[in-house]
Amino acid sequence: MKKYLLLFISIIAILSCSNRENTESKNIVIGAIMGNMADTFIKYIHDDLLEYSKSKENITILIKDASGDAGIEQNLVENLILQGVDGIMLQLVNPETSRAIDDLAKQSNIPILYFNHRPKGLEEGAYSYVGLNERRVGELQAEAALKVRNSGNAVILIGPLGTEAAEDRTKGVKDKIVNSGIKILREQSASWYRDRALTIVENWITSGLNIDFVFSNNDDMAIGAIQGLEASGKVMGTNKGEIMVFGVDATPDGMNLINDGKMYATIKQDTMVQASEALDAMIDLINNGTNIIKYLDAEVIISSKYK
């Protein structure tokens, strides 16, 4: 099977080279693979990508869901190559698989654009990416906290281990608070899920941990943390004895808690901006063949109850 796949990739590469000059006038078919649409934020990107693609003429989007499985994701890439798509947009499940996937795409001469999760192990300038500066996201959380309190006990809820978003958002928080009086007592991965975050936080409280700050790598885990804290009789806020909770994404559910004052702040990364910028970059990459790196802006949203 592997031999036939490589043969087919060679044929696709030849055809792709001969047709590249005509991509601007023909219908362009783009495969878009979402890492896991059970992730609320990724589902919003999916919806916005579909909506934005309607404004583009001669563009067909084939959206696939890897369901959080790196093996499934690689199979989806292979299937899209066999279908002869003009380009692949990829939100990586595991950035450690970047090399194998990138090699497949290069062998077929099909351009690939990574979005939301940056690849690992690829040379700078040798790939295309659209997404946030993830370390800056964590820094923004910490900066917002330090404007209110310069000391206290913190915990961090981390996304899937090994992903750039989880690692760099966590590093961003740590880098900013290193010279402050804020001490990190615990950090644990809840893999973006609110139910796992709820259980983790309840266990921390049950163990007697005294928490002043919860830094969460995304809104869903922050929501789970708030649910766990409330179930344990804790109060969210900025007064003495109250807990400040920070999220990322500004999802509708997260914004509801911002408006209620239960989440102190979230970092907004606009899903429509990510979807539209990624699709535009993919089309440009198909037509021009020049690698693109674009970092998108993030914005701190603080609950109006604390302004």
Task: Outline where the language-model segments fall.
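Hydrophobic alpha-helical segments within soluble ligand-binding/sensing domains
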Residues: 73, 129-154, 196-198, 250-254, ...
